[in-house]
Swiss-Prot record:
Coiled coil: none annotated. Belongs to the tRNA(Ile)-lysidine synthase family. It comes from the Bacteria. Keywords: ATP-binding, Cytoplasm, Ligase, Nucleotide-binding, tRNA processing. Ligates lysine onto the cytidine present at position 34 of the AUA codon-specific tRNA(Ile) that contains the anticodon CAU, in an ATP-dependent manner. Cytidine is converted to lysidine, thus changing the amino acid specificity of the tRNA from methionine to isoleucine. It comes from Mycoplasma genitalium (strain ATCC 33530 / DSM 19775 / NCTC 10195 / G37). The N-terminal region contains the highly conserved SGGXDS motif, predicted to be a P-loop motif involved in ATP binding. HAMAP family: tRNA_Ile_lys_synt (MF_01161). This is tRNA(Ile)-lysidine synthase. The lineage of its organism: Bacteria, Bacillati, Mycoplasmatota, Mycoplasmoidales, Mycoplasmoidaceae. PANTHER family: TRNA(ILE)-LYSIDINE SYNTHASE-RELATED. One of its GO terms (molecular function) is tRNA(Ile)-lysidine synthase activity. ATP binds at residues 12-17. Signal peptide: none annotated. NCBIfam families: lysidine_TilS_N.
């Protein structure tokens, strides 16, 4: 990491983000905490983050969600949007585009297992250590640690943290996967992690070969030419096209984009809040709306 105080950091009050806050305090310009007001212990978590930021002398922005907000069916997606909207606002305020998040290796294998369970081909399995999303450069410095290692470090260095009791409840698919993985031995987790990393490496190598063949298409992304490739290659080409334009999307969105470019679909497809994909003169094009 480069110069001082150039990152904002998402901190929930859990062991992961509290360890990250302590380890990278000299790099953090401001902490963002979102209180969703969905648990009886939400205020407890907020107060812990407030106290620790005060102790470390780090500015804090707390975004409190209206307790009367009607949550949609997919709570996690809605919560993520709220969270990233606040990250973007705070990053703009501090004139940066760099964000620290505290995902770790258990999060990585949870995500990978969810992707495999869904039986959908992905261009990357798990969670990237670095990526770009919603105009923010995201860094995940704890990806080298397992959850139990993080807890051990917190206890060793007397770093306070709270526990989200709902993580143990099978109310979301991610929680179900987490509870299943908790039954695995450390060796099983390590083996799964290594296997996923190998899978990602193979995908990247295949993508490199594909890109050499498809340089012309990336310069002029004709949807008719795209359909001459296999479905897997189509997904990888769309992914590469968007990455080239600094737009990060997941596998589900790429599937939706493939559906979108078929005839008789809507004229524009929302990629991010103000970025839309469209088909113009039989070619993919991006539309930016302010």
């Amino acid at each position: 990491m480069a110069s001082e105080k150039q990152y904002i950091a998402g901190v929930s009050g859990g062991s992961d983000s509290m360890l990250m806050l302590k380890l990278y305090q000299k790099k953090i310009a401001c902490v963002v905490h979102v209180n969703y007001n969905t648990r009886s212990t939400s205020l407890r978590d907020q107060k812990l983050v407030e106290q620790y930021c005060q102790k470390l002398n780090i500015p804090l922005v707390v975004h409190t969600v209206d307790p009367d907000l009607v949550w949609k069916k997919n709570f996690q997606n809605q919560a993520r949007k709220i969270r990233f909207d606040q990250f973007k606002k705070t990053a703009k305020l501090y004139q940066t585009n760099k964000l620290l998040l505290a995902h770790h290796r258990d999060d990585f294998i949870e995500q990978a297992k969810m992707q495999l369970d869904a039986k959908k081909r992905a261009v990357y399995y798990g969670i990237k250590t670095r990526c770009e999303l919603y105009g923010l450069k995201i860094y995940r410095p704890l990806m080298k640690y397992w959850k139990d290692e993080i807890i051990a470090l917190c206890r060793q260095d007397h770093i306070p943290y709270e526990i989200d009791e709902t993580n143990k409840l099978p109310i979301y698919k991610r929680n179900e996967v987490r509870l299943e993985i908790e039954k695995w031995s450390k060796i099983e987790k390590e083996q799964f992690y290594i296997a996923i990393c190998a899978m990602n490496k193979t995908i990247a190598q295949k993508l490199f070969v594909l890109m050499k063949k498809a340089k012309k298409w990336l310069l002029q992304p004709d949807v008719r030419e795209l359909k001459r490739f296999s479905i897997i290659d189509q997904k990888q080409l769309i992914y590469s096209y968007l990455i080239y334009h600094k737009i990060n999307v997941n596998g589900e969105k790429i599937d939706a984009i493939l559906d979108f470019i078929q005839p008789s679909q809507q004229k524009q497809y929302r990629l991010q809040n103000d970025i839309f994909l469209m088909v113009k003169n039989q070619c993919l094009a991006l539309l930016y709306k302010s």
